[in-house]
């Protein structure tokens, strides 16, 4: 009898993969792109989707079909595999992506709790300790990320987007900035790559395979099929959430021109819509998203 994930378990695994992908960069870049692209928003969004969704999901599929990252890289050359694998793990791990999860989420808490090096150190220690404890059991990530944190994260983003639809800041997008005035799709591709999800996808495929095996699916082809399908679910969720964020960013950019980062764009939007509660909303979104990604990268 052919092994197959149930629809419910497949959805949970897809939610887990989405949670692992959707971190600091995924929150920052789409709204800033929307604010900068203005009336050229949708061509730029198409480019962003190629590099921030298409390539990462392709990485998950490639690793699923090969078995693991080392086997995939060995197709280039046996000596290339260990070097490439180490560089990928370093770049998405301790060198760049993991430290960014704590620093970015803390910055969103500063307006609520204040700043200071001591407070940031305490927060970082607690943040990484909690993430490490969860990541010790990579085969059980679906129980926390897929069942609890991912629905909470999506729900909070939907609340922000619903507020943007119910009380739009403006009826029109602004003119695009100079870099998006021509070839906005190409600029979107370059911008989307900065999420670093293309590299992360090469690592996450193996983690998702572990979660599928933990649900009783042990046959290689069945694990491969489940991983690929979970990748498409995660890609669909990313597409929907990015569309919300770029639209919200475009509206905010028209009212608040010159905002330097996506974090500033989201903060301005949330504060305009919900006041002080908006700051709490955005901080919660960033903390959950960054925690999910940190767990995935450590695992």
Task: Annotate the PLM regions.
Residues 236-265:
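Extracellular/periplasmic helix-exit of transmembrane alpha-helices
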Residues 10-48, 58-62, 66-72, 208, ...:
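Transmembrane helix-boundary motif of multi-pass solute transporters/channels
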Residues 63-71, 128-149, 214-217:
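Membrane-water interface regions at transmembrane-helix termini and the short interhelical loops
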Residues 12-22, 163-170, 178-245, 281-293:
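Hydrophobic, membrane-embedded alpha-helices of multi-pass small-molecule transporters
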Residues 32, 81-114, 290-299:
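Hydrophobic transmembrane alpha-helices that form the core helical bundles
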Residues 12, 17, 21, 49-50, ...:
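Transmembrane alpha-helical segments of multi-pass small-molecule transport proteins
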Residues 4-8, 34-59, 75-84, 119-120, ...:
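Extracellular loop-to-transmembrane helix junctions
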């Amino acid at each position: 009898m052919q092994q197959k994930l149930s629809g419910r378990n497949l959805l949970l695994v897809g939610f887990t993969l989405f949670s692992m992908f959707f971190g600091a960069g995924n929150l920052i870049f789409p709204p800033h792109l929307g604010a900068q692209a203005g009336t050229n928003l949708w061509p730029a969004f198409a480019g962003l989707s190629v590099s921030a969704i298409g390539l990462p999901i392709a990485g998950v599929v490639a690793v699923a079909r090969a078995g693991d990252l080392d086997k995939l890289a060995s197709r280039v050359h046996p000596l290339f595999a260990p070097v490439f694998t180490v560089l990928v793990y370093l770049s998405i791990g301790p060198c760049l992506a993991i430290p960014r999860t704590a620093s970015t989420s803390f910055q969103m808490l500063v307006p609520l709790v204040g700043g200071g090096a001591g407070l940031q150190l305490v927060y970082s220690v607690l943040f990484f300790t909690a993430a490490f404890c969860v990541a010790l059991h990579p085969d059980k990530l679906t129980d926390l990320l897929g069942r609890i944190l991912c629905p909470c994260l999506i729900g909070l983003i939907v609340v922000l987007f619903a507020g943007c639809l119910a009380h739009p800041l403006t009826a029109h997008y602004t003119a695009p900035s100079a870099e998006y005035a021509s070839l906005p799709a190409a600029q979107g591709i370059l911008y989307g790559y900065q999420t670093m999800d293309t590299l992360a996808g090469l690592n996450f495929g193996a983690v998702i395979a572990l979660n599928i095996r933990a649900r009783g699916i042990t046959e290689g082809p069945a694990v491969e099929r489940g991983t690929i399908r979970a990748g498409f679910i995660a890609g669909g969720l990313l597409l929907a959430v990015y569309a919300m964020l770029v639209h919200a960013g475009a509206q905010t950019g028209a009212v608040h021109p010159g905002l330097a980062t996506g974090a500033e764009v989201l903060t301005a939007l949330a504060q305009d819509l919900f006041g002080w509660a908006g700051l709490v909303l955005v901080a919660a979104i960033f903390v959950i998203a960054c925690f999910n990604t940190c767990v995935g990268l450590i695992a």
